[in-house]
Amino acid sequence: MNATDMDTEAAFRNDHETIAGEDPFAMFGEWLELAHRKEINDANAMALATADPDGLPNVRMVLLKGFDREGFVFYTNTESQKGVELAENMQAAAVLHWKSLRRQVRFRGTVNRVSAEEADAYFVSRARASRIGAWASKQSRPLENRTALAKSVATEAARFGISDIPRPAFWTGFRIVPNCIEFWMDKPFRLHDRLVFKRSHSGEPWSALKLYP
């Protein structure tokens, strides 16, 4: 079922629907489109999990900024905690949970940097203040106070003036290339519907199976 064909209350009738499909990326696109219509804020927000060198996981919310048949893309400062952890361990997992839909999608796999051209194209699409912020913020490092951050922003704004703001070398995008994608739909009495797609490597066909809730 295409999300655009669903009436405004369809998301709340999970009780009578089941998850079905053969193409996880197409299914994700339909669910995300519906979420953009129903969620109050940031339907593309996802919890991203990485791990430090000791294997201790860290998780934080980031924004999914794109997806295609290769994977799911987000952007960050490479000197941030997640950037440093990804440099050591290029694997990650993420989940998007939509309370208004009573649905979620989670995926995991290897992580690759996007091309410089792709990162540049996205960076230039950001608001000018956000581009300045990318230069001003020493992400994940100690901050004395908000005044110090404001001064850093002012310094970078003065440095660039009205000129173009290039993408910092320490700021780029990452693509999670999934080997597992699971769709979850809430059902009464915790008898939820789960459909998982798996593959060994990118480009291989997906196998799909239902899971007990």
Curated annotation (Swiss-Prot):
Any one GO MF annotation of this record: pyridoxamine phosphate oxidase activity
GO biological process annotation, one example: pyridoxine biosynthetic process
UniProt: substrate binding residues: 65, 122, 126, 130, 190-192
Pathway(s) served: Cofactor metabolism; pyridoxal 5'-phosphate salvage; pyridoxal 5'-phosphate from pyridoxamine 5'-phosphate: step 1/1; Cofactor metabolism; pyridoxal 5'-phosphate salvage; pyridoxal 5'-phosphate from pyridoxine 5'-phosphate: step 1/1
Keywords: Flavoprotein, FMN, Oxidoreductase, Plasmid, Pyridoxine biosynthesis
Cofactor note (record): Binds 1 FMN per subunit.
Catalytic activity of the protein: pyridoxamine 5'-phosphate + O2 + H2O = pyridoxal 5'-phosphate + H2O2 + NH4(+); pyridoxine 5'-phosphate + O2 = pyridoxal 5'-phosphate + H2O2
InterPro entries attached to this UniProt entry: Pyridox_Oxase, Pyridox_Oxase_CS, Pyridox_Oxase_N, Pyridoxamine_oxidase_dimer_C, Split_barrel_FMN-bd
Alphabetical list of PROSITE patterns matching this protein: PYRIDOX_OXIDASE
Reported function: Catalyzes the oxidation of either pyridoxine 5'-phosphate (PNP) or pyridoxamine 5'-phosphate (PMP) into pyridoxal 5'-phosphate (PLP).
Family, per entry: Belongs to the pyridoxamine 5'-phosphate oxidase family.
Subunit text: Homodimer.
Protein name stated in the entry: Pyridoxine/pyridoxamine 5'-phosphate oxidase 2
